[in-house]
Amino acid sequence: MPSTPNFVRSNWSLVRTVGTTTSPFTGKTKTQEFDGVYWTAEVSLPPMRRSQAVEWQSFLLELNGTVNHFKFADPDALTNTGTYSTGHLTSELRTNSSSVTLSFSGSTITAGASTFGSAKVGDFIVVTGATNEDNNGTHKITTVTSATVVVTTSTFTTESNTASCKVRTNVKGATGLSLLASTNAASGTIKKGDYLQIQSAANTTGTPTQLVMVTEDATATADGAKDFYGVAIQPKLRSDLATGHYAVFTNPKGTFRLISNEVSWSADRISNYGISFSCIEVI
């Protein structure tokens, strides 16, 4: 995509697919969230002469309507506000148990095995298999009491000795990530409103699998050679983020395609061109 000129107007949206049913008798509403969550954008370029317009015309035409994809980002948030000092972080599965007995009380989770031995304060864990549905989902760790006990920001329904639960990190559906700084020297903040580019490999140049926004200032823990980061995100993680795969901090982008198969532009009497287009994140 051409780098200049920058857009003069942008409408940036997050679209969720949520089913809603309202009882005609009680008025109570039930909702169900589905996997279809994606960003959309409508953008307009400033008036430009033909020498610049042809770059954008060529780019848009080569997209072949909705067929081809391109990297794109929120035009008004191209640079993150956090001070994290290198280009990316890596995924680290500090908690990854596929079958463990769990008990829930207050804000505490107790495991029947050493599930939390590598967990850090600020990590986000995803629980599945609990009997009480409110106990499942993403939970943020505030205290690692021991290898079997953690305290979280959630309030649980009391439940004891439920077998075959899963406690994992960086899995599909997570609304928080457990990340590791890319080098011993990497440090700094990741701030609310920053974006991260989720990769399906250990590189920064491949096709992004998802673009997410940080929804609270990240928790950074210095413990050993590399800093650990717990990062709350929206939308939820679309697919598992494997160990070592990258979350790109510098110039993060998502993968987008045009919404329409039609490409058009306008020109005035002195040959100033006007170009606008709409795009949608690829799921």
Where are these regions (language model features)?
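N-terminal ordered "arm"
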Residues: 1-48
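Small/polar beta-strand repeat architecture
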Residues: 3-12, 81-121, 126-172, 183-188, ...
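A general structural signal for short secondary-structure junctions and capping/turn motifs
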Residues: 4, 31-36, 60-63, 141, ...
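Oligomerization/assembly interface segments of phage tail-like spikes and tubes
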Residues: 30-51, 265-283
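Glycine-rich, often proline-containing surface loops adjacent to acidic residues and nearby aromatics
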Residues: 37-42, 170-178
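Extended assembly-interface regions of large multimeric machines
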Residues: 41-94
